[in-house]
């Protein structure tokens, strides 16, 4: 099964990079508390690189978690066999990442400090990694103690919503450190509401 193969690959990658992943965790958690920690993280070449590696390592586990607990469960996936459904989820996530990248490139402005803009955009790497770790921990613990799968799903969705809200706040704070309140709001709408809204719409409407 595709799920088992990808899970094994993910496990091997995590084991190979375990020291790097453990070492970056304190910096990632600090970014949840203060927006300036994201600036400090990006100012360090090593920490920035390790954060990027962490985000890459979390890509497959995130998709597997979404698949396993049906966090993204639009009606058009009903009746699909496991492998095609997992492939569809990976495809949707890849499209989401691609759309974010295009928007981040297209909305770059000379009026904003390039380093600040880069830090704001890369904050998604930090919060994505933290979210994935929390989802894995939640799924593992609640499954082990026998919690109903639907309750696990709801808990994960609440965690996802809270982390995303915190991410929005921190990203906005980074933006307004280099531009006006209104400009920061417009950047946030363009870079976050469009791609995230598209994913939500694909799950609710279709």
Where are the model-predicted features located?
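N-terminal juxtamembrane cytosolic/stromal segments of multi-pass membrane proteins
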Residues: 1-53, 63
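Terminal transmembrane helical module of multi-pass membrane proteins
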Residues: 136-206
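Hydrophobic alpha-helical segments and helix pairs
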Residues: 38-90
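Alpha-helical transmembrane segments
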Residues: 1-16, 82-96, 150-160
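Hydrophobic alpha-helical transmembrane segments of multi-pass integral membrane proteins
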Residues: 52-69, 94-95, 99, 129-138, ...
